[in-house]
Regions:
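Short, charged, surface-exposed secondary-structure boundary motifs
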Residues: 140-142, 181-188, 203-205
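Charged phosphate-binding loop/patch that engages nucleotide di/tri-phosphates or the phosphate backbone
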Residues: 93-96, 182, 193-216
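Short acidic-hydrophobic, aromatic-tinged amphipathic segments that line or gate anion-handling sites
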Residues: 129-135, 188-200
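Acidic, Mg2+-coordinating phosphoryl-transfer loop and its flanking beta/alpha structural elements
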Residues: 149-195
Length: 216
């Protein structure tokens, strides 16, 4: 197999961001506007901007004091999502074989890149990860032109799907989440919906290439 270039999102794909963010919002504000049992509800959150249930001042204070500020370690403390460790173990093996692996995220914070690199190593076992921090994912993907792109944000995936003619060899995958199911029917043919990053890698046949090397 020729070497591939893989670009993987973090929050909602490998890291459990929403649950941690919700807990910080409630702890800092003393408010509890979320539906009962949200922590174990597989259909939560139903929308991308669920945090609007909290007042704007609360959200602003949390981002400034508990997330963006140096040494708060918000990103470092996030829990991995199910199958995240298996996915990153596979990505590590692919990187050893010479494939290019990039983690692309729109996270914010004074030391967010360092926290993210440490998280990938400490929580998922990925040494020396290549982490790109950018809110302009579309432009980063346009520049990298990867063979596989995986994200959970519908607007990002659909924006790339509209211009899929630019990247005829790129596989675009949307990780299925409750908040990204309002999909434009005419674009569904231009990307693949998967249950996890691991599933995206498996569907691309990348797990079989690693298994062949291990068995030989």
């Amino acid at each position: 197999m020729s070497h591939k270039r893989l670009v993987i999102d973090l929050d909602g794909c490998l890291a459990s961001f929403n649950e941690a963010y919700a807990q910080v919002l409630m702890n800092e504000s003393g408010l509890d506007p979320l539906p009962p049992g949200w922590e174990i509800d597989p259909h939560w959150p139903p929308v991308w901007d669920w945090d609007r249930a909290f007042p704007p001042t609360v959200r602003m204070n949390v981002w400034e004091k508990r997330i963006r500020r140096r040494n708060t370690n918000f990103w470092l403390r996030l829990d991995p999502l199910p199958q995240a460790k298996e996915a990153v173990q596979l990505l590590h093996m692919l990187a050893i074989k010479g494939h290019e692996v990039y983690f692309l995220t729109a996270r914010e914070g004074q030391d967010v890149k360092l926290q993210t690199e440490d998280w990938l190593l400490m929580k998922l076992g990925m040494p020396c990860p290549t982490v790109i921090i950018s809110t302009e994912k579309h432009h980063i993907v346009n520049g990298l032109q990867p063979d596989l792109f995986v994200d959970d944000r519908l607007s990002t995936v659909e924006a790339l799907a509209v211009e899929n003619w630019k990247w005829p060899n790129m596989e675009i995958c949307l990780v299925d989440r409750p908040y990204n199911r309002d999909r434009k029917p005419h674009l569904l043919k231009d990307y693949t919906v998967v249950g996890s990053v691991l599933e995206a890698l498996q569907q691309a046949g990348l797990d079989s290439s690693v298994n062949r090397v291990v068995e030989s």
